[in-house]
Every structure is written in structure tokens, then in C-alpha cells.
Amino acid sequence: RRPVAGELFGATGTMASLGSQGLLVQQRMMARLGLPAPLASASGARDAAVEVVLYLALLAGTLGKAAQDISQLTWTEIGEAAEPAMGGRDTSSALPHKANPILSWRVKNAADTLQAHAATALRCLRQAQMRSGVGMLEQEVVAQAFTVAEECLDVSQTLLSGLEVRQDRMRENCEITQGLSMSESVQIALAAHT
């Protein structure tokens, strides 16, 4: 776990307004907030904000991978899982036998959005002379990243807490191959004799 550091350096990043007590004031303020003191002013080093966005993108990416797998398991021809019913919003307009994996799609879309935000956040590292206007973009990206991450977590919670796992269908799918999907150990044993 990497905590976000606090920030207290003043407008120019020098603590000039705090005089000779600047570091002491910063240390006490961070202790009171329960945050570590930053190594450098955020005016010159943008990595802390970028790291937060990258962390959120990683979190959403993990949830997006799970959602992608779940959406495939809900396919009619696989049928090993079903999303919680969405009151008709998940029904296909053209295929009455099909339920669309709306929750999985929402999680995957949130993960894609956060990946795009991560790329933009990385661009914000290259601010010219500390004040090039990129900071405005960074503020927007960080705020949007938290909003999208919250949605991703909320929808994932709904998806996973209501997920129907169809063990009987999993068993049927495994039996289709008549054991061939479990034949790796046989292959390894035979390889020793070739």
C-alpha cells in the first residue's frame, strides 16, 4: 500500500511564506492529517497525482478482466453464469432467449475509461516550468478518475453479489471434452518416453 503524501509548499513550492519554520509546520500538519510528508513540491513533481490515477486504472483493470470473463460465461452457448436481473434492461431487443451482460459491460467500459485517464495523467508529468496549464488537465483527470473508479466498484459489487454461478452447466461443459481438458498430466508422462 502506497499512501498519497500531503502537500504544503506554498504557491512557488519554496515554503517562503512559512519562513524558517516551514519544514516544521509541514511535518506537524502532515502528522495531524495522518499523511507522510512529500519528498518534493507538487509544483515540480507531478508523480503523486499520476500514481493515484494509475492505481485506480490498475484496480479497474482487474475488475474489468473479471467482468470480461463473466460476460463470456453468460453467453448462451457457454451458460455457466448469469448476471443479476436488471428489470428488463438486460433483455435483448432482437433475441428473446438472450440476456445482455449490462453490468459486465459497464465495468469493462469503466476500466477502458480509466486506462485512457491513466495515459492522460502520464502526459501531465511533462509540465513546462511547473506552470504550463497542464495542471488544469491533471485536476480534471484526477477528479474524473475517482468518479469512474467509484462507479466501477459499485457496479462490480452489484455484479458479484448477484452473480448466479451455474455449476451444473460447468460440469456439462467439462464433460463435452470427455476428459481431454484434463489430459496435461498424460502428455507430460508420455513426453518422457519420446
Question: Which residue stretches match the model-derived regions?
Answer:
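Internal glycine-rich alpha/beta core junctions
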Residues: 1-124
